[in-house]
């Protein structure tokens, strides 16, 4: 699960997204990764741990989770020492970075709806994303020849990804009702995602971290909660504050740079 830049300029050529990662399986696989362990040894162990009967599905799940090596990173330490809320935030803070449809849905659906809902005296159902809006979004993102079954599964998968980070509430069994909401991620999970991005963007302002960073886009916290997360990250050594021309700046902290950031 490496964090690399994603080019959305050609998003309309995407194929469907129908294969999903079982959250419990992913948590189990990462829990059994230890610093110094070879990838081959981890893969062999992971194959034994997964309950799926089919070898092809086990290989697919392992491929979704694996990285190039197992190191004593800040991410692994926080994950294995963390509570369930933190572990889920860390997992999806890495996993969804490389999913263009998640990023696009956040920017085109979730944040515009939150902006409408946060206005004084918002319109009725301002937080609602209507079914036809979902359909237009998915249709614009995928190739025109995607079968209807794959179209429906992709729509469901994107919704599930947004729900996993707390920005979408889904209700109803037949007609799905989807409402946006501000996420409340574990503070250190949020701070880690900010700090990881700061390794590639060496210096940014606190307003950027709270509103424009990938973590802010993904979890969509309110400004006061984002500030709390950043304070927690500084206290834990994931982030470091500095000042430039009387402006507070953020940098990746010493806790990110020892033993490998990822």
PLM features per residue range, with description:
Residues 65-69, 113, 138, 142, ...:
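Hydrophobic, Leu/Ile/Phe/Ala-enriched alpha-helical segments that form helix-helix packing faces
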Residues 1-124, 129, 133:
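Eukaryotic partner-binding/assembly regions in large regulatory complexes
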